[in-house]
């Protein structure tokens, strides 16, 4: 097996200067506080998606502008849209109202230029937004496009975490990601579950991925599961129970098939242990 660290990719200096200037401006505006974030999101989305619009309110109110165009402009302001989590009975409406403008900016930025599959700038934009959305966000957070959250405010993220494209992080309960966690494309991490009898009966519990955990392509981790340090959930697996440290669990439901070869001796202990109670 060949060791292949990531390459450093340079962009033209002129583009890099614009990137730096805009990230600096974004961070300054974020620092002004939540009371300004609806306007912040609207201003940037208008600049990105409708750069010809110089007077937003006038254009939205103008009966000469086609209705569909006015609807598109309205949707650039987070106050004019609703997101699915706003309909959940367990939402903290005040906390969500605080982060909603930044979530809407994040999601919509991903669907227009210069977002999407571009890496150089969008990773920095998401890194700037995340500390203002999450309960905690460590250093060097790296997130690719089309990642979605439930509430956002129940995310606890360590250092050097990488989340790849099209991941769902359902933080209706709490999701804790330790240092150096890697979540691959199309994975789903849940922290709530529904009764099989009554769909409206919902249980939310913390889901924990400890340090150096890897959740691989299209895998799912269900609510309340703890993946231990250096544990791994294989491609397309569904983790319904805890994954022991250093173990590789695969299949549906996911079961341990091996221990990583660099694991310490105690990782090979196989006796059954009692499942820990859910964290408060």
Regions found by a protein language model. Give the residues of each.
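Short beta-to-alpha loop/turn elements within the nucleotide-binding domains of ABC transporters
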Residues: 225, 236-237, 243, 252
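Terminal amphipathic alpha-helical/low-complexity segments used for targeting or macromolecular assembly
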Residues: 1-132, 257, 262-280
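Short proline/glycine- and basic residue-enriched helix-capping loop/turn segments at helix->loop/beta transitions
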Residues: 136
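Short-chain dehydrogenase/reductase
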Residues: 182, 214, 232, 238, ...
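Flexible, glycine/small-residue-enriched loop-and-beta-strand segment within the central core
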Residues: 112, 116-127, 133, 145-227, ...
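Conserved catalytic segment of ABC-fold P-loop ATPases
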Residues: 228-229, 244-246
């Amino acid at each position: 097996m060949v060791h292949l660290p990531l390459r450093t990719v340079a962009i033209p200096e002129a583009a890099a200067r614009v990137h730096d200037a805009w990230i600096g401006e974004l961070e300054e505006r974020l620092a002004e506080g939540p009371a300004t974030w609806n306007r912040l999101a609207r201003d940037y989305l208008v600049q990105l998606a409708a750069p010809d619009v110089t007077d937003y309110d006038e254009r939205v109110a103008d009966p000469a502008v086609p209705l569909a165009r006015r609807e598109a402009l309205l949707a650039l302001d987070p106050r004019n849209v609703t997101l699915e989590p706003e309909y959940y009975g367990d939402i903290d409406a005040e906390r969500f109202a605080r982060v909603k403008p930044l979530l809407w900016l994040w999601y919509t930025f991903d669907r227009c230029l210069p977002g999407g599959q571009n890496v150089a700038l969008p990773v920095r934009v998401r890194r700037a937004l995340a500390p203002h959305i999450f309960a905690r966000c460590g250093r060097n957070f790296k997130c690719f496009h089309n990642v979605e959250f439930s509430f956002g405010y129940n995310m606890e993220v360590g250092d050097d975490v990488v989340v790849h494209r099209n991941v769902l992080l359902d933080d209706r309960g709490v999701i804790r990601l330790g240092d150096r966690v890697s979540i691959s494309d199309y994975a789903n991490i849940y922290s709530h579950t529904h009764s099989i009898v009554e769909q409206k009966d919902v249980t939310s519990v913390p889901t924990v991925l400890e340090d150096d955990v890897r959740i691989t392509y299209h895998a799912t981790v269900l609510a309340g599961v703890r993946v231990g340090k250096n544990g791994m959930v294989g491609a397309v697996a569904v983790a319904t129970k805890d994954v022991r440290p250093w173990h590789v669990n695969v299949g549906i439901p996911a079961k341990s098939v091996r221990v990583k070869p660099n694991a310490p001796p105690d990782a090979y202990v196989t006796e059954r242990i009692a499942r820990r109670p859910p964290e408060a």
